[in-house]
Structures are given as C-alpha cells and as structure tokens.
C-alpha cells in the first residue's frame, strides 16, 4: 500500500446532482439526472479567499470509467484529489476546481461528442455543465481559465473539444486519446 502524506491541507469533494434537458430521452435510455463529483481546493473555503474565484478543469474519464471513479481511493497510488492536494501543497500547482462529469452510458462510456445514437455529450458538457458550474461555484467563468483533459476516450473527447469547441476551452490535455471514433458514429 502506498504511504500517503497526512500533514497537508486537503481539498474537499462535493457532489452535484444535475438534471439534463439535453440528455433526456436519449436513444439508449440512459439517465438524464446525473450525479458528479467536484474537487474544491482547501483555499476555496478559507476566510481570506471568500471572494476569490478559481480556474476550472474538466476531467473526462476513459471508456468504462466515470467521474465518480476518478475520485476513489487507490491502493498503490494517489487518487486524483490526493495528487492535486500534494501538488498544491508543494506549490507546483495553483489551487483550482476540478469537475468530474458523469458521462457514462449503458455501452460503457462515450467519446464526449454529439451522437444521434448515444447522446449529445458535447452539448451536455458545454451548454449545461459549464454554465451550471459557473453559476454554482466561484469559478473564473471564461475560456482563458477553463481547461479540459482526459485519458483514453476522455483524451479523445478533450482533443475534439479543443478543435470544435474552442470558445469554451482555453487549455486541453490528452493522455493516450483514442482515435477514429468519428468513423464509428
């Protein structure tokens, strides 16, 4: 088991339940009410930061993964929130909010695109979740302070969003993004 640092300030995970108009009635019959976690850095709740706004990063899970899975405990490595806490503590990162969207489908996931067969997940992220986060949290609500990253299918989604939805994203990261999904849909 990985020995984890206990002497650093930790952020918190809050859960949002969002009712999507865009995902309602999708052909797969997947839920349109989604619960997803959001990482909040400890500085967000600090009294001296009560008016401070924070950049936001959307973390897109890979195929068969979910936003909920991205915040889980890991036995031999740091979870995403643990890693972010450590890097903020070491001053290698500045504090920011991380959104872990729930875009899981009955097929095991998606590529965060709009699909007549699976659902309009690009629109769900850009037209519903971004405004929801910006209205509920003290976020820096502009593309210059918003990023999107992912691994595998999430990496593909991040690349597509970086190319097709540039008015929403100021930074993109893709780790092993799969490709050729546009030929499948």
Annotate each predicted stretch with a short phrase.
Residues 1-185:
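Non-catalytic cap/lid and distal C-terminal segments of serine-dependent acyl enzymes
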